[in-house]
Curated annotation (Swiss-Prot):
Catalyzes the phosphorolysis of diverse nucleosides, yielding D-ribose 1-phosphate and the respective free bases. Can use uridine, adenosine, guanosine, cytidine, thymidine, inosine and xanthosine as substrates. Also catalyzes the reverse reactions. GO terms for cellular component: cytosol. It catalyses: a purine D-ribonucleoside + phosphate = a purine nucleobase + alpha-D-ribose 1-phosphate; adenosine + phosphate = alpha-D-ribose 1-phosphate + adenine; cytidine + phosphate = cytosine + alpha-D-ribose 1-phosphate; guanosine + phosphate = alpha-D-ribose 1-phosphate + guanine. GO terms for molecular function: guanosine phosphorylase activity; purine-nucleoside phosphorylase activity; thymidine phosphorylase activity; uridine phosphorylase activity. This is Pyrimidine/purine nucleoside phosphorylase. The keyword Transferase applies. It comes from Acidovorax ebreus (strain TPSY) (Diaphorobacter sp. (strain TPSY)). InterPro entries: Ppnp (IPR009664), RmlC-like_jellyroll (IPR014710), RmlC_Cupin_sf (IPR011051). Keywords: Glycosyltransferase, Transferase. The lineage of its organism: Bacteria, Pseudomonadati, Pseudomonadota, Betaproteobacteria, Burkholderiales. Belongs to the nucleoside phosphorylase PpnP family. It is an enzyme of class 2 (transferase).
Length: 105
């Protein structure tokens, strides 16, 4: 199931822009203090670092990801998720716009 709408959150209106605009996101804060981000990655191959563990939920498009220390690229599409350990890196390869929700912690 793909998340299509998020209700009852505070949205930071200033966008987070990374990699010369290849990734753009906005921060969400839930009433209980939970933080997430929602964004899009445009066609590119990028490397992201994590502080906290992350779950990347694909809500549109698709991507391939490669976790730090592995050789395999894994494809995910709308309605699928992948987990990234904290204090690590992952590569993401996108050939069409990849829309996501990033769940932290």
């Amino acid at each position: 199931m793909t998340t299509e709408k998020i209700d009852g959150v505070s949205v930071t209106t200033q966008a987070n822009v990374y990699f010369d605009g290849k990734c753009v996101s906005h921060n969400l804060t839930y009433p209980d203090g939970t933080k997430k981000s929602v964004g899009v990655v445009l066609p590119a191959t990028l490397t992201f670092g994590t502080g906290a563990p992350e779950i990347m939920e694909c809500v549109g498009g698709s991507c391939e990801y490669q976790l730090d220390g592995t050789d395999a690229w894994v494809k995910v599409g709308a309605g699928e998720k992948f987990s990234v350990p904290g204090n690590s890196k992952f590569n993401i390869r996108v050939t069409e716009a990849f829309h996501y929700i990033c769940h932290y912690g």
